[in-house]
A protein has these predicted regions:
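Terminal leader/tail segments of proteins
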Residues: 1-80
Length: 80
C-alpha cells in the first residue's frame, strides 16, 4: 500500500502533468502558482488521472493548502 507521501506525490505529479497547460487552471504571480481545484483521485493503468467528486471536495478544502503544495512543487522540482 502506498504511503500518504507517495499518494500525495502521485496526485501532484498527475495534476501538474495533466492540468498545467489547461487554460484557467493556474494563475501565476510572483513565481507562485495559485488556485487549482481539478478533482483527482488516482492514476489509471495508463498514468492518466481519474476524477471523482469526492476528491474534488477533498483537494478543494482551502486555498492555503493549494498554495502550499504549489510552492513545494516550485521550490523542489525534483521532489515530484
Amino acid at each position: 500500500m502506498a504511503s500518504k507521501n507517495d499518494t500525495r506525490r502521485a496526485v501532484v505529479r498527475a495534476f501538474f502533468r495533466r492540468e498545467y497547460k489547461a487554460a484557467g487552471n493556474f494563475h501565476t504571480a510572483d513565481g507562485v502558482l495559485y488556485s487549482y481545484s481539478w478533482p483527482i483521485e488516482r492514476l489509471d493503468e495508463n498514468g492518466r488521472a481519474v476524477e471523482t467528486e469526492k476528491t474534488y471536495q477533498q483537494y478543494s478544502k482551502t486555498t492555503s493548502e493549494h498554495q502550499a503544495m504549489a510552492r513545494l512543487a516550485i521550490s523542489n522540482p525534483g521532489y515530484f
